[in-house]
Curated annotation (Swiss-Prot):
It comes from Yersinia pestis. GO terms for cellular component: plasma membrane. This is Zinc transporter ZitB. It is found in: Cell inner membrane. The gene is zitB. Involved in zinc efflux across the cytoplasmic membrane, thus reducing zinc accumulation in the cytoplasm and rendering bacteria more resistant to zinc. It may contribute to zinc homeostasis at low concentrations of zinc.
């Protein structure tokens, strides 16, 4: 595992631990306050925070286990646990949204008495806690992995839930109109639904070993052929991501170089600096490529008839 990855994982672990402690404390506070005040918005927010605590715990454990070194049975290590945790958390958030909307519809047609003052006080406290947790998870300039982003989405959902509870409490205190409580619960749920669905698709794509969405494979192939003179064709490209690490295997049809290892290093350096691909296994070929995916920047066969296999 790269040193930068280790430092990133340690930073993520500290962020998640702080957010977990704060979220758990306010989850208990909101649950008690929601029960005493009769507020669905507060109970919904407490339910969110309960799942947030679970989500942050899952994310924290995923980071912890992902730091284990590779072994003969898990040659890539346990980095994919962070992606799996993100998928579970996104799926759980979708389920929570459905349950809250269901309860809100029921509460709208069967109104309950809501105590506005305790609801407002607890909602403000919850909002401050969620703002702090969201800041903790997002501070710093380094890119956050999908696991931390999934946990942050849970916190964001609670942050919006606290805002909704505050607005509902103010409306109830000033007008006595209690249907605002379930209405805002549904509104907050809808706001979260899109982000949760997008994160679910992204984590599922990564679990299926799909290529990172921001990388255009055809552009990458052309870039290598254009910027490295000896490279005439790139084919049999496979690109995927494990945790925060991008990996690639490819075949490169090249002009027989004077220094094989130097050319290999130039290809790998280009992939690292331009596409952040930290582990690339390159097989160089010195003869004509005749397979269907050899159509990009195809050149006439280079001199020489032998094939050299090189794996990092």
């Amino acid at each position: 595992m790269a040193v930068s990855t280790i430092f990133s994982q340690d930073s993520n672990s500290k962020r998640l631990l702080i957010a977990f402690a704060i979220t758990t404390l306010f989850m208990v506070t909101e649950a008690i306050g929601g029960w005493l005040s009769g507020s669905l918005a507060l109970l919904a927010d407490a339910g969110h925070m309960l799942t947030d605590s679970a989500a942050l715990f899952i994310a924290l454990m995923a980071v912890h286990f992902s730091q284990r070194k590779p072994d003969p049975r898990h040659t890539f290590g346990y980095l994919r646990l962070t992606t799996l945790a993100a998928f579970v958390n996104a799926a759980a958030l979708l389920l929570i949204v459905i349950l809250i909307v269901w309860e809100a519809v029921h509460r709208f047609f069967s109104p309950h008495e809501v105590m506005g003052t305790p609801m407002l006080i607890i909602a403000i406290a919850g909002l401050l806690a969620n703002i702090f947790c969201f800041w903790i998870l997002h501070k710093g300039e380094e890119e956050k992995n999908i696991n931390v982003r999934a946990a942050a989405l849970h916190v964001l959902s609670d942050l919006l839930g606290s805002v909704g509870a505050m607005i509902a409490a103010i409306v109830i205190l000033t007008t006595g109109w209690t249907p605002i409580d379930p209405i805002l619960s549904v509104l907050v749920s809808v706001l979260i639904l899109r982000s949760a669905w997008r994160l679910l698709k992204e984590s599922f794509h990564e679990l299926l070993e799909g290529a990172p969405q921001e990388i255009d494979i055809n552009k990458l192939r052309k870039d290598l052929c254009t910027n490295i003179y000896e490279v005439r064709n790139i084919h049999h490209v496979h690109l995927w991501q494990v945790g925060e690490q991008r990996l690639m295997t490819l075949h490169a049809q090249v002009i027989p170089p004077l220094d094989h290892d130097a050319l290999l290093q130039r290809i790998q350096d280009y992939l690292l600096h331009h596409y952040r691909i930290s582990h690339a296994t390159v097989q160089m070929e010195y003869q004509h490529c005749g397979t269907p995916d050899c159509g990009i920047n195809q050149a006439a066969p280079a001199d020489g008839h032998h094939r050299h296999h090189h794996h990092e």
